Amino acid sequence: MTTTQGSGRRAALTRRPRPSLSNKLARGLWGAVWLLLFRPSPRIFHGWRRVLLRAFGARIASGALVYPSARIWAPWNLEMGAGSTLGDGVDCYSVDKVILGPRAVVSQRAYLCTASRDIDDPGLALVTAPIVLERRAWVTAEVFVGPGVTLEEGAVAAARSVVTRSVRAWTVVGGNPARPIGARPPVED
């Protein structure tokens, strides 16, 4: 179940043991904090949500935006660069690392999935791989991004795409499974 990282490929999937009791307790505590303090916070209180996420181990740069309806499974596996965004309704299943570079955007109701099951294993072992969105990458509305995917600098996944392979810089992909459908001009900061 391993593939090489790079354009059109996924990172190697890592077999994981069952979550420990401490992991389950931490996720339970985070779930309570999300429900009571994160989710009901006013839309413009991005700073408050950054504080809550950092308290649970997330590495979040100033200016990163996380909307109140975004769900983060394990904040300690989340890294967000300056100006990056997790939009409304995003589901960040961060069993492994989810890394958003500067100005990377994940739009409404997208699903970032870092884990799956090994269908070749009779016990269906949990396997994970990180998801990386490099600088200015954009996951648009309702896109599914699978384990081990990297969207290189400026790459775009068009609405409702299913992205299971990494995407080259400044390339636009769409469909199920996602395939290149265009390019966008490079942008300098």
Residue ranges with predicted function:
Residues A61, T150, R168:
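Short conserved AdoMet
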Residues P40-R50, A70-M80, T85-T150, N176-P177, ...:
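Flexible, glycine/small-residue-enriched loop-and-beta-strand segment within the central core
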Residues A141-R165:
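Beta-rich strand-turn-strand
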